[in-house]
Amino acid sequence: MIQVYGIKNCDKIRATKKWLENSGIDYTFYDLKKEPLTREELQEFVHRIGLDVLVNKRGTTWRNLKLKDKDLSDDEMFQILLDNQTMIKRPVLIKDEAILVGYDEEAFEGFVED
């Protein structure tokens, strides 16, 4: 079963859920606003795909926190991400050991077939 992490009212999440449903694929959705990742879960995500992939530098949270010109260590960025999980690029899809970040229907097709 695929796990989808994101925010319920996010357009990318809505599109992802619709794509999965139209493709007949079962999934479990985790709303990061209602069920934030634990430190350990976020560490696992970062370990598997890296902060650069996980952080949404185009989003509202990134802009509101004015992080663009700050020189932050990975530890500082991790803590900011843990405290501001709306800054996680969406969606995050997990299937077994595979993880996929961002909305990309072509990538979804390969991801669900593996």
Residue ranges of each PLM-predicted region?
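Local sequence-structure signature of Cys/Sec-based thiol-disulfide redox active-site neighborhoods
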Residues: M1-K18, N22-S23, T28-L32
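Thiol/selenol-based redox catalytic cores and closely related redox-interacting motifs
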Residues: K34-D114
